[in-house]
Amino acid sequence: MPSRQLQILIRKTLPLVPDHVLIIGESGIAFSKATNLLGQEFEHILFDGRNGIHLEALAIAAGTLKMGGTLCLVLSDWENLSQQPDQDSLRWNGNQSAIATPNFIYHFKQCIERYHFPILREESAVEFPTVFYSNEHHKNATLAQQQIIENILQAEQDIYFLTAKRGRGKSALLGMLANQIQAPVYLTAPNKSAVHSVIEFSEGDIEFIAPDELALTLQTEPEFSQSAWLLVDEAAMIPLPLLQEYSRYFQHIVFSTTIHSYEGTGRGFELKFKRKIHRTFQHFELKQPLRWQENDPLEHFIDDLLLLNAEDDFQHFDYSNITYNIEENAKNLSFPCLRGKVPEGPKGDLDIASLPQALEALLTSKGSEGKYNRQFFFRDFYGLMTIAHYRTSPLDLRRLLDGKNQRFYFAEYQQNLLGAIWALEEGNMADDELIIQIQQGKRRPKGNLVPQALCFHENLSQACKLRSLRISRIAVQPNWQQKGIGQNLMQAMENADVDFLSVSFGYTDELAKFWQKCGFVLVHLGEHQEASSGCYSAIALKGISKEGLALVDTAYKQFQRNLPLSFHPFAINFEQNQLDWQLDDFDWMSLKNFANFHRTLFSSIPAMRRLLKLAGKENFPLISAYLTKKQFPINKKKGVECLRLEIKQYLERGTL
């Protein structure tokens, strides 16, 4: 049986293709809808990459291609591809317009060359031969699948982890397992359309429940989980708090997840999950591909292109009590193309520097001796990020390679990357009118996540004008954690020519204590829990310059002043000094922006409560009723409009 193939076709227009060829892109399945293709198989696929390469969709296409099939990637140019604006950059770069992505294109072309895939110029050269492969022989369990099923059915452990790369028969195993369990079986997954293989192999004798609905049902009808089994497909894509909730009710659970996939679900998920849930575990992994041949060139190409093996290839280094120096150079340079070597540094030193600056040194180094091949150093950096953040995804890879306004700091000791920080430059906005519109909620331009949040939610417009560095990711080798590496990396950042440092994170007590230990103060808690983590978003700041220190001090005092008067669930977790009921300039700004523009109700509640305290509830019957019941008699949108009008009418009267 022939291997699956990738062909690159260089054309300004899409070629005409037979009906049995699936088109992904402008004239077919939208890139954003590609996840709905998971679990299906297609003979041939035409991928429209003329305006940019959507990496996740490309990986999905490769994962759904049948054995012997052809994936044709259409590009508008080849020789000048690195100079063309990539429309996909609008998803991951903060700019308002598309940018060229020379570093990714260099990496992409290297991978194409490595696997000798053809570059075609004529439409007639593309071939979509009939594929005679059938997966009927995989309807029965393989030996590896049957052994895992038998082990799970013995039910000697509480929780089972099943991992596999795509195309290994993981979904089929879940379905066949459900057939043999002599108890009720429930299935949940983040995407119902992707589990039809599980349902097919279970012969329909399994009930699917969406993750949120399952959690709600467990809270209202906990008895339904008694004696039942739960199968969780693509578990790493479901927030950990929900998985923890499931584990409190079901005696036996099988958590299944794809490793080395477009979703960015690394092996770190299992380790992180085990630290959260204290139950007995057993892990199984399917390794033999079933839907294509061993050593399939297309699979290897996707693995290399998306650096899917970077996590496994990362070299862990045992901790030793070394004496090291800290060097900091945060000159912001563009990420060079990946070639060359890193010059040798002083033996035994721990070097912390801006990654682009360090990689710039690779280009200018005249010596041939070096401790790192740059391609491998880049893989190490990405691998370390994947270990620490199991949802590191192809989107992050694209941003890492070509994103603008980035700075990278790393700790390295004798050819081993110990820790790293990935930071983004923010602020330094000069358009006063735009800043006013951000504060009013009229505009939300791309980028500047923390400055815009502080401006809109906390009325701190100065945050947009000052220069700041936001820590996007921080990672330290597992063996070197709790050794001060992370704090030392952040100390090096303090030499940057900015006014303050910031970080946005999913709030947990553990993370809050870590950032506090690093000198940051909490200044914002989001209204809603993040879907990805189940945590409330939080913002913490650390002042650097005189202006930055003043901003952080104001932000912290406002946060401490307003949180006790908010309805945030965490308000009771923080020390509450004497409540401040006096209306200040920030409060009046909040009220005006709520009444006349788009300030949120949640952010305005402290100011509204102070207004009612001083002006009397009789002037605000609607607001008083809402603050008492914390709900609207009508739908929320109309209810908020009524509250805005009540505040607006009062402000227009100009009386207190």
Curated annotation (Swiss-Prot):
It is an enzyme of class 2 (transferase). It catalyses: cytidine(34) in elongator tRNA(Met) + acetyl-CoA + ATP + H2O = N(4)-acetylcytidine(34) in elongator tRNA(Met) + ADP + phosphate + CoA + H(+). Its EC number is 2.3.1.193. Keywords: Acyltransferase, ATP-binding, Cytoplasm, Nucleotide-binding, RNA-binding, Transferase, tRNA processing, tRNA-binding. GO terms for cellular component: cytoplasm. This is tRNA(Met) cytidine acetyltransferase TmcA. Belongs to the RNA cytidine acetyltransferase family. TmcA subfamily. The keyword Transmembrane helix does not apply. GO terms for molecular function: 18S rRNA cytidine N-acetyltransferase activity; ATP binding; tRNA binding; tRNA N4-acetyltransferase activity. GO terms for biological process: rRNA acetylation involved in maturation of SSU-rRNA; tRNA acetylation; tRNA wobble cytosine modification. PANTHER family: N-ACETYLTRANSFERASE 10, RNA CYTIDINE ACETYLTRANSFERASE. CDD domains: NAT_SF. It is found in: Cytoplasm. It comes from the Bacteria. ATP binds at residues 145, 167-176, 291. Pfam families: GNAT_acetyltr_2 (PF13718), NAT10_TcmA_helicase (PF05127), tRNA_bind_3 (PF17176). Acetyl-CoA binds at residues 474-476, 481-487, 510. SUPFAM superfamilies: Acyl-CoA N-acyltransferases (Nat) (SSF55729), P-loop containing nucleoside triphosphate hydrolases (SSF52540). Catalyzes the formation of N(4)-acetylcytidine (ac(4)C) at the wobble position of tRNA(Met), by using acetyl-CoA as an acetyl donor and ATP (or GTP). The gene is tmcA. Residues 368-542 form the N-acetyltransferase domain. It comes from Haemophilus influenzae (strain ATCC 51907 / DSM 11121 / KW20 / Rd).
